[in-house]
Amino acid sequence: MATALALRSLYRARPSLRCPPVELPWAPRRGHRLSPADDELYQRTRISLLQREAAQAMYIDSYNSRGFMINGNRVLGPCALLPHSVVQWNVGSHQDITEDSFSLFWLLEPRIEIVVVGTGDRTERLQSQVLQAMRQRGIAVEVQDTPNACATFNFLCHEGRVTGAALIPPPGGTSLTSLGQAAQ
């Protein structure tokens, strides 16, 4: 400690021992305007897009007790809708929905904002640990009956939100007529 104190006092007493401050010619100063010669770190970033048009959003055209019609493609049984794809979802009822069955929603990039869950012909309560796992990962969950979940999913996609859906087809009595058939 005494040596450090002695060196400090010597350093203050003899300014010639100090190293002159180094001024870097490329370092920005107050009031400095950027020029093309400046370092890349201080220049604006430019983004060029490979695909100019936004990808077509997923829309549920119709549903029945056997499955769903999504963007004109028939999907049989329960399915998970992701921003640009549809996958079969291996659940039989709302009781089969676990943390593992939702894991595909939090593994994706860009991150999904909200998952709409259709539980059949009635709104059913999901297990609390499943909802808590989604909440911890920053994903909102909206649980509805399948007819309302389909409408909510379409609405959120139309708004441009990053949305996922986990849908179980409703049993026999309910169905949505395809929008194309309803117009005829």
From Swiss-Prot:
Main location: nucleus
Mitochondrion among keywords: yes
Signal sequence region: none
Alphabetized InterPro entries for the sequence: MTH938-like_sf (IPR036748), NDUF3 (IPR034095), NDUFAF3/AAMDC (IPR007523)
GO CC, one annotated term: mitochondrion
SUPFAM superfamilies: MTH938-like
One GO term of the biological process aspect: mitochondrial respiratory chain complex I assembly
Gene3D superfamilies, sorted: MTH938-like (3.40.1230.10)
Domain of life: Eukaryota
Localization per Swiss-Prot or TrEMBL: Nucleus; Mitochondrion inner membrane
Keywords: Disease variant, Membrane, Mitochondrion, Mitochondrion inner membrane, Nucleus, Primary mitochondrial disease
Function (record text): Essential factor for the assembly of mitochondrial NADH:ubiquinone oxidoreductase complex (complex I).
The protein's assembly and partners: Interacts with NDUFAF4, NDUFS2 and NDUFS3.
Pathological condition linked to this protein in its record: Mitochondrial complex I deficiency, nuclear type 18: A form of mitochondrial complex I deficiency, the most common biochemical signature of mitochondrial disorders, a group of highly heterogeneous conditions characterized by defective oxidative phosphorylation, which collectively affects 1 in 5-10000 live births. Clinical disorders have variable severity, ranging from lethal neonatal disease to adult-onset neurodegenerative disorders.
Similarity remark: Belongs to the NDUFAF3 family.
Protein name in UniProt: NADH dehydrogenase [ubiquinone] 1 alpha subcomplex assembly factor 3
Designated gene of the protein: NDUFAF3
